[in-house]
Amino acid sequence: MKRQIKKIESLKEIAPLIAAVQIRDIRLVEAGVSTSVRSATEAGEIKFEVATSADVKEYNKDEGIFWVLAQIKIRLIPVEPEKDAVVSVSAAFEIKYSLPKELRASQKQLNTFARINGVFNAWPYWREFVQNMVARMNLPTITLPVFRLEDTTKIRRKKPDKNIR
């Protein structure tokens, strides 16, 4: 229950930012893909494991521009225990946001915004990237669910792998 209360307070704290920011640019800055199988049959039944993180990388107060680095990694792992991941896809997206001139934000507010909205805003690009990469591996298409602030799908968010930069 305390976690839910904290999320609500965090959302209230950044509500003016959420209502006012604009995305100016989003670009892929790092990516990695790998597979250990040649077919869906070889992979067997799988489940998703997703790790996300996002941080403010730079804030130019004079211009009202800030950049967020959103990192996402998915591992498709067999349902059978003792087997390694069959597919791993990681990506980092840099998102450039602008604030209206009259709105000033503290570093704490920007960091909270980055953690909540950074991944949320990168998610559609991420979904397309994963779908494209898995198809290029000649494996069946994977359609990831929409991103939710609360985890209501099979996706489990964990701390990101230290290899994601």
For the regions a language model picked out, list residue spans one by one.
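N-terminal intrinsically disordered, cationic/polar leader segments
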Residues: 1-121, 128, 132-165
